[in-house]
Amino acid sequence: MLEIKGLTKKFGSKTVINDFSMTVADNEIMAIVGPSGAGKTTLLRCITGLERVNAGAFYWNGKQFDPVNPDKNDTIIGVVFQDYQLFPNLTVMGNITLAPTLVKKLGADEVEKTATALLERLGLGGKENLYPYQLSGGQKQRVAIVRALAMNPKILCYDEPTSALDPALRDEVAQIILDLKKQKMTQIVVTHDMDFAKNVADEIQQVEQIQ
């Protein structure tokens, strides 16, 4: 279970998130929704350690942790970015195996075996040697999901996973998220799309812009 207690984030004198608390149960899909400018992406960046908080604490199963300084051997949070952030000079396999080998110091054979299994699971078998420019938008997103899963996180977070996707791809993303839930993956989805949130989420947390 993930617990966030009293999270506050400021940029200079502007408070973007004020005393925010949230609990995400194991194997649950939590959607964070709200209008543009309400701080959804900033909240996700705090949860994933890309932004330092001004106040607040994070707990995983009752044990406090710091997303900014994670334990390299025990990944709690994984993230799929809105723009995927794949390395254009690396193949699909290279994108997926880079972090596990560099950060977790896992052996190349072990990492490639895991990556191959994940690619098959998400319908990307045979794409290992392609480069990002050779992939469709939906395929790039699935590679980004596989890359996050390869670090074996406890929780997988998504930043606006349906932005700029047509209805068919939105349904595909929803199915991937629901399939991962069946495999006991806890997930947090940041989205402006309430219909999508209702389709996938067990619980919806609404955030409003601070006046």
Show the residue positions of the predicted features.
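A short, proline-enriched helix->beta-strand linker immediately N-terminal to the Walker B motif
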Residues: 150-154
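Helix-to-loop junction immediately C-terminal to a conserved catalytic motif
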Residues: 48
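Helix N-cap at the start of a conserved alpha-helix in ABC-type nucleotide-binding domains
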Residues: 167-169
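Conserved ABC ATPase signature
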Residues: 131-135, 139
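Catalytic Walker B motif of ABC-type/P-loop ATPase nucleotide-binding domains
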Residues: 156-159
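The feature captures the beta-strand-to-loop junction immediately N-terminal to the Walker
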Residues: 33-35
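ABC ATPase NBD coupling module
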Residues: 64-78, 108, 182
